Amino acid sequence: MAIGLVGRKVGMTRVFQEDGASVPVTVIEVLANRVTQVKSDDTDGYRALQVTTGEKKASRVTKPLAGHFAKAGTEAGRGLWEFRLQNGEGEDYAVGSELTVDIFAEVNKVDVTGTSKGKGFAGTVKRWNFSMQDATHGNSLSHRAPGSIGQNQSPGKVFKGKKMAGQMGNEQVTTQSLELVRVDAERSLLLIKGAVPGATGSDVIVKPAVKA
């Protein structure tokens, strides 16, 4: 897994290319990601880079976390995130060092992970794109009903993962291979073509695309 950055979704706008084409972009504000811990096989059983970003009032930081940030010599951030490291990755980073948008200077495609907008309780037609049943022809009650959810006494249960009505959205979603239109190092911004998961103001993780 490649090293990425944690940012905040600012909103959407558009930029114009040299040929005059209008490109819709999502603006991601990426404040410096501070390394709080470098995990290793010997001590943690796996290799990873733990980072934080932003700031948090001292009164809102728990004592264990306050001690963790103090040990790293960094200011308390709004959360902790990890990036798994492959062989040879992350050797240039030490506790207290910073990651900025400059690491995307030569990247063209990115994967963006965020928490999708919650849509509340939704039926199967809206949530899973089920087809509706007949509007007439004798159907008076089951227009949007899901239909059968199982078999008979054997197996005698509804299988796990069955698509049914329930909470829609508010789950971790990754959108892959989005074009990175611009890296604004001066204002710590990433401009990514198209929409990314999550509401305005939510945290997102941006990484080089695995399928690029």
From Swiss-Prot:
TM segment ranges: none
Chain positions with N5-methylglutamine modification: 153
Q: List the disulfide bonds.
A: none
Q: Return the Pfam families for the record.
A: Ribosomal_L3
Gene Ontology terms, MF aspect:
rRNA binding; structural constituent of ribosome
PROSITE patterns, from UniProt?
RIBOSOMAL_L3
Instruction: Output the PTM entry.
Output: Methylated by PrmB.
**What is a single cellular component term in the Gene Ontology annotation?**
cytosolic large ribosomal subunit
GO biological process terms, alphabetically, are: translation
The record, for SUPFAM superfamilies, names: Translation proteins
Record note on quaternary structure: Part of the 50S ribosomal subunit. Forms a cluster with proteins L14 and L19.
Query: Any idea what job this protein has?
Result: One of the primary rRNA binding proteins, it binds directly near the 3'-end of the 23S rRNA, where it nucleates assembly of the 50S subunit.
NCBIfam families per the UniProt record, alphabetical: L3_bact (TIGR03625)
Q: What is this protein called?
A: Large ribosomal subunit protein uL3
